[in-house]
């Protein structure tokens, strides 16, 4: 039998730990726990595993041997947290009662935390308490939930809210059970292990730090073999259990000490409550531990080093350290947006360990030790600060600011990075003290370790870093070295990577990469110098920046190396430090002028001497150094000096506030240039400065009396210029402060000089850029402006020095100032905000930008395209020129045709190819594309030649662009039409081969080079051309993220098309989809699966129907037609749907996890419907349905669709119970078959329906919209409601006809009547307060009067200032909602008449008239995107009233004179709101005609200018006649506005969209 370790808890050795101890479990239980009945309870997942089955067999055998008279029962609950409920507990208890179990029963709970908690609670209450044995099978359960006797079930209001303390008789921890654990669950459990060590045992924490790499390597391998780490794993579990057992023994009922076990849980549980089940408990606690450790640091209790150790240890186990962690965000998807400060605080307020509503957390004092051994009350303000990356810096208060202060900054970043490189290159062991623990050094340490350059460990609770150097013997590794935005590390490691040798088991190269900003920062001069010295270095993205691919085994040749050092001294230091390892001695000559930051070069040389290599300056050649060959000899101890750049911030604080501050460990003897800041900058500005060789003290003048510096050369301390700039900002004088010598600051984390100019302007301080510096015009601090929250306060550009500098100026303002991205200070001073708060007494407050959580843009994980340029590819005649122009119009981009660019440089393409051949042409073509993608990377549409994909170089460029998130759009049209067109085109080169052969060759290239695809259907008429443009712009909105529609919230239907070719029904599509919110394309039922045909089918849908497309490929195993075995084709066809920009992609959960994840990773802005179909009729009470639902949630699906099969009516009832319990994600759930029709009726979201106009039905038991509504109404789900048109006169109103037509078509039971009156009060008393009231259509004279009877207003109603639609507010009896749909009537009328969405292009509109409708017209034109809205009327006083009452961003101009009309920009859209029954005033007509004339004749217009007349009688009004016949404008009759506003009104009333054709005909019938 394997060794068993016993742990005592509450005086009993009842916790037994070992590996493979199942025989011991059986023998111990049956020997010592005598019973007539043993019940083993697990879940259905564990039930199927080999270890469980072995344990069951051994129990059965043991029972025969030890207790032959006893009974043994088994029970399996459904798995998952959602089944840890009172209902499941009752089911278990019913089973025990049915089996005749009595008080002597022994229950053995085998499973994870869910089983242990719930079955423990069963044991606590069954027969008033029976014995229980815990056999935990997950790491989390082994070290946490099974220990200590806590039992519980969840309730709808929270986790573990109903439970009891009930100690198990035994806890048997058999670590071999972990072989059944998925990798993620394994890692999840390590959070609790790290926690127990962090609060109790520093020695064990150190062991865990060292064990992490081995552990992760084993548990993430394809074939997990725990035997290789068995001893370490048992010790890991055992030590964690011992901690918890000690704590529980001292405090069983969690009255004091046991609260320590909740370290990380206050915040972690709050996060978990929001993101479960996508994120696991341990993952959330890991984030919680980091945040609670940061809170302890914020209080000044925990050292920054300890926080860094904790963060690094958690990260080493692949656990998240923030809610912004890349993997964490991928897992929780759009729920990231729900993690908001107020929500978290609300969750924390109901934590069980709180004192009433006072939030308490566990505070670490050191690794292995808790502060005062209790949980502490925490203010919401302090919590809000640590929970967000944005902070409000409150004004510095004289009463809370210490008059004198001593601050010790962290270790120098410059010295720390150099010390690590030298130590890794050196031989022997060095103990580095006061090393900066920051993002930069973390990346450096990780890189050195990855390259096997040194063995790295810690001492003194992490304060000392021990580096055992390998003498420069680095070898390649598998992974890329990610350096974040660590510029110093990237430049030093570029040369180090040139020294790396080849690891035969890995790559023959090293890749250095970083974040987006790092991939813009220059490294070119260094690379050029290294290339010239024998290194092979390749740029993988942008020329001159990371990522770099550096060939291993090349080394440095040595000899003379010339380097341009006018941009960065770090290039020089990089080569200096590595030069001793070159083949020959190095002579380093710095060319191109005086080197920048000479003091940092001197620092490097001095440090090299400390490590045993002496550099000599050439006595004759300026800026030239001789470096001997050799190996560094590591000193025993190396002390890193505090960071002089960081020291400038506390010193500047003293200068600005008139107080005193001492930095005790930086003085005149410092290696760092920034040590001169106090003497050279602050002293001349009026400060008293005392500087010894080792310390610096600054005392500021009285507040507000700083003097400007006429000129200061800060070349020796360039990083400190930002600090100097904010001090100069309040040096009030007519003389500006001029700072020079800082040109290198333009290529740091950001362009710091420009950043300082832009951000100072937000404070009302003028600053100007100089060629190598900045000039600042200081003002009185009392006159500082407060950067507005609306404009997002101070932007830090993710730059630590920008953030720290402006944190000082912010406190000088009269009101709090927002600083964004505050955590960027982690680069050099992770604890800066804590120092500001604790040492300087500054009030800080967390801030979070308000979000509309209903914004569909929050539901996607992809960033919107924004200003990023769009590349268009495709065959000639595919429509690239036209559609590229449409893209440019919509996006507001410039259009570049690369063929035109070529001809401007090289002449006619045909002639060039004749003279030079296709090969040379393709080479130049690729070069041009690369050039323009670089210099026109934003706000351009780049249209390419048809053969751009013929060149491999061009293909690589295009594919690289898609990988960086750029859009490469492939346009295509019917090939036969293309051939007809190209056969007659003599302006382009003839193809060597036939057109079809060319397409056959290029097709796969087009698909692999593009990430989006649009098929242009043939347009035979102007009307079809307009439809194409409208559908293309809708497509463009989807793929760029500019226009995303949310999942419907009310009852909604989707028309499921079972057609082999949609062209057969195209003309009837608008009628077919009546009443539906989406349309499903069943791709598997199409006659052809080729990309071109499938794309054509989506084009048909877009041409005839303006509805979201659901793209579905159903395999035969899931009731469809696509072959189950052709997985590769299924994946390609699914990805095609994403490229086609469909709104929804149906993904079958029956596919492999790898398949599903690969599709979801590419989904962009397409929503995912995670679908599972079981046509065998699996009961809805089975756990498999829970598993599928949770699987959909874990994939961050936007909608989950579960389809069963009904054998009996009861199946529908069971389904509704399931639906009621599964509300996290929108659910489509119904039963197929005749018996399942009721479930279709009861389904709320996107119910699949058919149409009476279709001959084929895609689903068994499918119904029409009308059938469902009628049935739902008959069973009481849809009550009859009464709607009215109110106002006077209304006798000729067509609203009753419009709404009634919609009711009849959709089988809605409602009634629409007229209620004629002039009095809103009468409407309220006699209509709105009556039972069955559904809503109002409001017309004159009541649109204003009715507003006092509504409780809420839509945005449109608020701005327009009138209501035309009223509905009762759901769940709020006696309260009503007011809306205005007139604006929608205008916009949709324009859209239906071919006016495209013009997005960011410059289109102007005009409103004629000054009545109530004019306000709706102005609102409509603004919604459409008009940049400027002109208004004209016979009398202008009303127009000025309208202008002043509407938002300023409507950009309204009132045209009063003819001169103003003539000076106006051309107008493309006009809405006439004047009566049509009398002629226009002549003066007004003159102005209107001039506008119409200029609109028609404007130079740049992308559509026919269009006029809409809001008057619907007569059908053709005088102004329409003038616009169309005299000036060639398109015109829209007012009846269209009436219908379109009614369509939205109908939807507001009923949640359904009425069939347009039916309601239109009802309105125009007899309406001439």
From Swiss-Prot:
Catalytic residues identified in the record: 254, 269, 824
Subcellular location(s) of the protein: Cytoplasm
Annotated coiled-coil segments of the chain: none
Region annotation 3-dehydroquinate synthase: where it falls in the sequence: 1-380
Pfam family, one: EPSP_synthase
Any one Gene Ontology molecular-function term assigned to this protein's record: 3-dehydroquinate dehydratase activity
Alphabetized NCBIfam families for the sequence: aroA, aroB, aroD, Shik-DH-AROM
Function: The AROM polypeptide catalyzes 5 consecutive enzymatic reactions in prechorismate polyaromatic amino acid biosynthesis.
Known partners and oligomeric status: Homodimer.
Protein's name according to its UniProt entry: Pentafunctional AROM polypeptide
Organism of this sequence: Clavispora lusitaniae (strain ATCC 42720) (Yeast)
Gene: ARO1
């Amino acid at each position: 039998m394997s060794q068993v370790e016993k742990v005592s808890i509450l005086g009993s050795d009842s916790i037994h730990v070992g590996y493979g101890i199942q025989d011991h479990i059986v023998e111990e239980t049956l020997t010592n726990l005598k019973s007539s009945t043993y019940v083993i309870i697990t879940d259905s997942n564990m039930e199927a595993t080999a270890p469980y089955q072995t344990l069951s067999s051994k129990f059965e055998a043991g029972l025969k041997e030890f207790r032959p008279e006893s009974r043994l029962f088994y029970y399996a609950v459904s798995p998952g947290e959602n089944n840890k409920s009172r209902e499941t507990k009752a089911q278990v208890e019913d089973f025990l009662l049915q089996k005749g179990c009595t008080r002597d029963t022994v229950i053995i709970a085998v499973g994870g935390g869910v089983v242990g908690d719930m079955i423990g609670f069963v044991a606590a209450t069954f027969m008033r308490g029976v014995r229980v044995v815990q056999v935990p099978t997950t790491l989390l359960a082994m070290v946490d939930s099974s220990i200590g006797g806590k039992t519980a079930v969840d309730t709808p209001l929270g986790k573990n809210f109903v439970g009891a303390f009930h100690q198990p008789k035994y806890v048997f921890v058999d670590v071999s059970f972990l072989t059944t654990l998925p990798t993620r669950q394994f890692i999840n459990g390590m959070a609790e292990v790290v926690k127990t060590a962090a609060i109790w045992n520093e020695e064990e924490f150190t062991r865990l730090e060292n064990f992490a790499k081995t552990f992760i390597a084993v548990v993430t391998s394809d074939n997990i073999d725990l035997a290789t780490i068995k001893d370490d794993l048992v010790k890991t579990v055992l030590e964690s259990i011992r901690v918890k057992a000690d704590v529980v023994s001292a405090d069983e009922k969690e009255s004091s000490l046991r609260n320590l076990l909740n370290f990380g849980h206050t915040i972690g549980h709050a996060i978990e409550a929001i993101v479960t089940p996508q994120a696991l408990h341990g993952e959330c606690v890991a984030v919680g531990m980091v945040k609670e450790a940061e809170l302890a640091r914020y209080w000044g209790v925990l050292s920054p080093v300890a926080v860094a150790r904790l963060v690094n240890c958690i990260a080493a186990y692949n656990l998240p350290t923030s809610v912004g962690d890349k993997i964490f965000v991928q897992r929780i998807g759009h729920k990231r947006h729900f993690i908001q400060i107020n929500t978290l605080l609300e969750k924390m307020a109901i934590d069980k360990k709180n004192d009433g509503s006072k939030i308490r957390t566990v505070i670490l004092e050191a690794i292995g030790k808790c502060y005062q051994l209790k949980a502490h009350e925490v203010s919401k303000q302090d919590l809000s600060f640590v929970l967000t990356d944005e902070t409000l810096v409150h004004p510095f208060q004289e009463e809370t600011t210490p008059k004198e202060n001593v601050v010790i900054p962290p270790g120098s970043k410059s010295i720390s990075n150099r010390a690590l490189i030298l130590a890794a290159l050196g031989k022997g062991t060095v103990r580095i003290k006061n090393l900066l623990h920051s993002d930069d050094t973390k990346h450096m340490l990780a890189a050195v370790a990855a390259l096997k350059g040194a063995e790295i460990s810690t001492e003194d609770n992490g304060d000392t870093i021990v580096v055992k150097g390998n003498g420069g013997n680095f070898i390649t590794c598998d992974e890329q070295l990610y350096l974040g935005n660590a510029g110093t590390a990237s430049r030093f490691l570029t040369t180090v990577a040139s020294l790396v040798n080849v690891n035969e088991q890995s790559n023959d190269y090293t890749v250095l990469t970083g974040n987006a900003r790092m991939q813009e920062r220059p490294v070119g001069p260094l690379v050029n110098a290294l290339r010239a010295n024998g290194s092979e270095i390749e740029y993988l993205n942008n020329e001159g920046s990371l990522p770099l691919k550096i060939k291993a085994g090349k080394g440095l040749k040595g000899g003379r190396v010339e380097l341009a050092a006018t941009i960065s001294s770090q290039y020089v230091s990089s080569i200096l430090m590595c030069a001793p390892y070159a083949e020959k001695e190095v002579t380093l000559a710095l060319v191109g002028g005086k080197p920048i930051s000479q003091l940092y070069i001197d620092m490097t040389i001095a440090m090299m001497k400390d490590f045993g290599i002496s550099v000599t300056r050439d006595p004759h050649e300026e800026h030239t150094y001789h470096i001997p060959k050799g190996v560094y000899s590591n000193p025993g101890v190396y002390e890193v000096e505090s960071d002089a750049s960081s020291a400038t911030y506390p010193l500047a604080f003293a200068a600005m506030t008139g107080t005193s501050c001492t930095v005790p460990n930086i003085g005149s003897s410092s290696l760092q240039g920034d040590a001169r800041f106090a003497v050279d900058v602050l002293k001349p500005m009026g400060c008293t400065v005392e500087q010894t060789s080792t310390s610096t003290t600054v005392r500021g003048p009285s507040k507000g009396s700083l003097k400007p510096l006429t000129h200061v050369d800060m070349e020796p301390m360039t990083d400190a210029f930002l600090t100097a700039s904010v001090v100069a900002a309040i040096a009030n004088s007519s003389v500006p402060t001029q700072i020079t010598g800082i040109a290198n600051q333009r290529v740091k984390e950001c362009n710091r000089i420009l950043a300082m100019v832009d951000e100072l302007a937000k404070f009302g301080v003028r600053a100007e850029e100089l060629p190598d510096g900045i000039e600042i015009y200081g003002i009185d601090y009392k006159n500082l402006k407060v950067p507005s929250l609306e404009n997002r306060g101070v932007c830090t550009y993710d730059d630590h020095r920008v953030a720290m500098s402006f944190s000082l100026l912010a406190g000088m303002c009269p009101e709090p100032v927002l600083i964004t991205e505050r955590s960027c200070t982690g680069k050099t001073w992770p604890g800066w905000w804590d120092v500001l708060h604790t040492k300087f007494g500054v009030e800080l407050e967390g801030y979070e930008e308000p979000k509309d959580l209903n914004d569909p843009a929050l539901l996607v994980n992809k960033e919107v395209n924004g200003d990023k340029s769009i590349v268009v590819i495709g065959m000639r005649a595919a429509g690239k020129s036209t559609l590229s122009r449409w893209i440019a119009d919509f996006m507001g981009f410039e259009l570049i045709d690369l063929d035109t660019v070529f001809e401007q440089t090289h002449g006619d393409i045909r002639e060039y190819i004749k003279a030079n051949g296709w090969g040379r042409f393709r080479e130049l073509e690729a070069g041009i594309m690369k050039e323009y993608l670089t210099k026109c990377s934003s706000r351009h549409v780049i249209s390419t030649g048809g053969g751009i994909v013929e060149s491999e170089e061009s293909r690589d460029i295009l594919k690289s662009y898609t990988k960086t998130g750029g859009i490469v759009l492939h346009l295509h049209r019917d090939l036969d039409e293309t051939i007809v067109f190209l056969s007659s085109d003599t302006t382009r080169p003839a193809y060597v081969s036939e057109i079809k052969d060319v397409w056959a060759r290029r097709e796969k290239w087009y698909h692999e080079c593009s990430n989006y695809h649009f098929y242009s259907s043939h347009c035979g008429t102007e009307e079809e051309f307009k439809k194409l443009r409208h559908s293309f712009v809708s497509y463009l909105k989807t793929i760029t993220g500019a226009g995303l529609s949310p999942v419907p919230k009310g009852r909604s239907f989707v028309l499921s098309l079972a057609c082999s070719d949609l062209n057969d029904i195209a003309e009837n599509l608008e009628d077919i989809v009546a009443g539906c919110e989406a349309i499903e394309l069943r791709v598997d039922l199409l006659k052809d699966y080729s990309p071109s045909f499938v794309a054509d089918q989506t084009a048909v849908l877009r041409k005839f129907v303006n509805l979201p497309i659901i793209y579905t490929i159903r395999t035969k195993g899931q009731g469809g037609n696509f072959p189950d075995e052709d997985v590769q084709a299924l994946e390609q066809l699914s990805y095609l749907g994403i490229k086609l920009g469909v709104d929804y992609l149906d993904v079958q959960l029956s596919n492999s996890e790898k398949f599903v994840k690969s599709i979801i990773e590419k989904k962009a802005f397409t929503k995912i419907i995670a679908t599972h179909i079981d046509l065998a009729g699996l009961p809805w009470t089975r756990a498999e349905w829970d598993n599928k639902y949770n699987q959909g949630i874990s994939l961050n699906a936007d909608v989950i669709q579960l389809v069963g099969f009904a054998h009996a009516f009861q199946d529908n009832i069971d389904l509704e119970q399931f639906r009621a319990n599964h509300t996290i994600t929108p659910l489509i759930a119904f039963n197929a078959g005749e018996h399942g029709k009721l479930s279709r009726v009861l389904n709320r979201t996107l119910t699949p329906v058919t149409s009476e106009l279709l001959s084929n039905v895609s689903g068994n038991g499918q119904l029409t919209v009308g059938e469902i509504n009628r049935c739902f109404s008959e069973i009481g789900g849809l009550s009859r409601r009464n709607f009215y048109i109110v106002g006077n006169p209304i006798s000729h109103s067509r609203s009753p006809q419009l709404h009634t037509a919609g009711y009849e078509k959709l089988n809605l039971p409602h009634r629409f009547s007229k209620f004629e009156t002039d009095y809103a009060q009468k409407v309220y008393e006699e209509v709105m307060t009556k039972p069955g009231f559904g809503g109002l259509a409001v017309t004159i004279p009541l649109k204003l009067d009715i507003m006092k009877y509504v409780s809420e207003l839509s945005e449109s109603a608020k701005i327009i200032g009138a209501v035309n639609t009223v509905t009762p507010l759901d769940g709020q009896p006696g309260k009503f909602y007011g809306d205005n749909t007139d604006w929608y009537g205008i916009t949709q009328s324009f859209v239906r008449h071919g006016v495209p969405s013009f997005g960011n292009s410059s289109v102007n509109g005009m409103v004629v008239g000054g009545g109530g409708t004019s306000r709706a017209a102005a609102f409509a034109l603004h919604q459409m995107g008009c940049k400027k809205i002109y208004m004209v009327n016979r009398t202008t006083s009303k127009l000025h009233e309208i202008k002043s009452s509407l938002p300023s961003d409507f950009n309204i101009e009132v045209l009063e004179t003819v001169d103003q009309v003539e000076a106006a920009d051309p107008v493309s859209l006009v809405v006439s709101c004047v009566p049509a029954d009398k002629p226009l005033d002549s003066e007004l007509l003159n102005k209107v005609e001039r506008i119409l004339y200029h609109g028609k004749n404007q130079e740049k217009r992308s559509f026919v200018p269009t006029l809409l007349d809001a008057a619907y009688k007569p059908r053709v009004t005088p102004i329409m006649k003038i616009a169309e016949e005299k000036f060639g404008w398109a015109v829209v009759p007012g009846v269209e506005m009436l219908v379109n506003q009614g369509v939205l009104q109908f939807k507001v009333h009923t949640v359904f969209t009425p069939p347009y054709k039916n309601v239109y005909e009802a309105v125009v019938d007899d309406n001439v």
